[in-house]
Amino acid sequence: MNLKTVFRAAAVFMGMWILGMWFAPELIMDQYGWQYTPGLTMMMRFMGLSMAALATLHWLIPEWSGNNISKFGMVSGIFWALFGAFGVYDLALNNVPHNANTIIGAVINFVFAILFYLNSKKEAK
């Protein structure tokens, strides 16, 4: 696996969340035990748009970055680790239910962080 593949896989993973936020917000809210409200639904649409921007950047960074891809990979890895840390934090404080979706979601964020880090180190050599 190379860094370009990691960026693309991350974009696809975000794409699944984007679809959920735009077309099945109730399903997403149910996973986290949130009450369905019109305000939260509207916020999910905007979060989906923000995630679409990030997914687009993840998809295009390998094309734009040239020899600097490892620098982008390191920065991306830091943010993926932060997303994972927030997931663990919310689990620890019981802000979200302890179920497979929330636990696996945090783990996947850490997996992407590790993949970005390892592949960035490999590309930098």
Positions of PLM-derived features:
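Non-cytosolic membrane-interface motifs at loop->transmembrane helix junctions
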Residues: G33-T41, K71, V96-A106
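Membrane-embedded alpha-helical segments of multi-pass transporters/permeases
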Residues: W22, W59, V88, A113-Y117
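Core segments of alpha-helical transmembrane spans in multipass integral membrane proteins
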Residues: M16-W17, L40-P62, V75-L82
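Juxtamembrane helix-break-helix junctions at the cytosolic face
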Residues: L57-S70, L91
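Membrane-water interface at the C-terminal end of transmembrane alpha helices
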Residues: N109-K125
